[in-house]
Amino acid sequence: MGQKIHPLGFRIGITQKHRSSWFASSKDYSVLLQEDHKIRSFIHGKLSNASIAKIEINRKADQVEVLIATARPGIVLGKSGAGIESLRNSLTLILDPNKQIRVNVVEISDPDSEATLVAEFITQQLEKRVAFRRAVRQAVQRAQRANTQGVKIQVSGRLNGAEIARSEWVREGRVPLQTLRADIDYCHRQAHTTYGVLGVKVWLFKGELLPDSKVVELAPSQDQINPDVS
């Protein structure tokens, strides 16, 4: 029986890069790993309506740099950067107070090309009791307008309140999961409805990277917002 590997982990070093970038001794590794989990959980909980696509964490000595990629930077930044300062102070309470924390925000210009945001859109629609086929169709149309070369969406659970759970999926275009050079974005989310939990999976195919192409890094650039706030 075939087994499905995680599309992002399968392509690390080829089309994907690690979301956490740091080195540690075997003694400190588990501590820093738990810190990363706490940082991501806290930010997603505090900014649940900010359309956050990804959070990258870089560590250098006693510095922790948190890079937030969001489609709604205004919610993260707050008025005059107050949101960033509040977030940084909250993270200081969670982590070692001796560590210097920097928070940078990068705006996502096309949210419909991010699997995380597409999956969140579908879960929000399902939780509002929108029919799953309509929610999936709208998500597929939005992804196609974002110039993705292929999209696949699967919804599992008690669809439309059916007594027997099942899975249904839709695919438009190409989604070559076994091609390592294919730039595949993937996300899994859960929708909590009155009938139970529905699982939502989204695959987006953004094209193939040539052998000489480098993994695109999410780093502060001209699109970065408020780089001096730390």
From Swiss-Prot:
Keyword Zinc: no
GO CC annotations on file: chloroplast; cytosolic small ribosomal subunit
Pfam families noted in UniProt: KH_2, Ribosomal_S3_C
GO process terms (BP): translation
Domain KH type-2: 39-109
Alphabetical keyword list: Chloroplast, Plastid, Ribonucleoprotein, Ribosomal protein, RNA-binding, rRNA-binding
Compartment(s): Plastid, Chloroplast
InterPro entries the UniProt entry points to: KH_dom, KH_dom-like_a/b, KH_dom_type_2, KH_sf_prok-type, Ribosomal_S3_C_sf, Ribosomal_uS3_bac-typ, Ribosomal_uS3_C, Ribosomal_uS3_CS
Record CDD domains: KH-II_30S_S3
Gene Ontology MF term list: rRNA binding; structural constituent of ribosome
Subunit structure: Part of the 30S ribosomal subunit.
Family of this protein: Belongs to the universal ribosomal protein uS3 family.
Protein name stated in the entry: Small ribosomal subunit protein uS3c
